[in-house]
C-alpha cells in the first residue's frame, strides 16, 4: 500500500472529530446557567427521567424528619415553668410578667448579699454589743514585743507609725501596751517579793512613771 492511504485515513478521522465542534460557539470563562453541553445531552436527560423522585426537591425523601420539633411554630418554644425547684431561674411563656421579674430581682439580691463582705470597722459598736477578744498574729506580737523592749510608753506619733506598719488601729496598739505593762509590773512585783531588794524605790522614780502613764492617756 502507498503512504497516501494512511494520510487520507488519518485526515478523514480528524475531520470527522472536528465536525462535532462546528456548531459550538466561543463563550467566556463563566458558564451560563441555562447552557447545555452537547456531549451530555441525551444521556443525562435519560438518567434524570428514569429516576424522577430522586432529583425532585419537593419529593418526600428530602423532607426532614425533625421538622415538627425544630419548626418555628409557637408550640416548640413554649416551655412551662418548673415547680420542683424554686431557687433556679425558670423560663416562662411571657418574659414580661411581673412574677418572673420579681424572681430575677430576688435572686440577684441574694447573690449580692452573699458576695458582700463585712469588715470589722463596719460592725456596730453599741453598748449592748459584746466586744470580742482581739487576736494578734505571730508577726504582730513579735514586733510589739520588740517595741516594748525599747519603749514601754509610746507617743501618739510612734503609735500611729506602728499601727500603719502592722495593719492595726491606734486603740489596739494602746490596749496591747497597757496590758503588756500590767503584765510586766506583775512579773517584777513577784520577783521583788521573792527576792527582797536592799533599797526601796524612791518616790521620785514612782512619780516619773506615773507622769509617763498620764501623758500616754492624754495622747
UniProtKB/Swiss-Prot annotation:
PROSITE patterns: ANTENNAPEDIA (PS00032), HOMEOBOX_1 (PS00027), HOMEOBOX_2 (PS50071). Residues 186-219 are annotated as: Disordered. SUPFAM superfamilies: Homeodomain-like. Residues 195-205 have a biased composition (Polar residues). It is found in: Nucleus. InterPro entries: Antp_homeobox, HD, HD_metazoa, Homeobox_antennapedia, Homeobox_Antennapedia_CS, Homeobox_CS, Homeodomain-like_sf. Keywords: Developmental protein, DNA-binding, Homeobox, Nucleus, Transcription, Transcription regulation. GO terms for cellular component: nucleus. GO terms for biological process: anterior/posterior pattern specification; regulation of transcription by RNA polymerase II. PANTHER family: HOMEOBOX PROTEIN HOX, HOMEOBOX PROTEIN HOX-A7. Sequence-specific transcription factor which is part of a developmental regulatory system that provides cells with specific positional identities on the anterior-posterior axis. Belongs to the Antp homeobox family. This is Homeobox protein Hox-A7. The lineage of its organism: Eukaryota, Metazoa, Chordata, Craniata, Vertebrata.
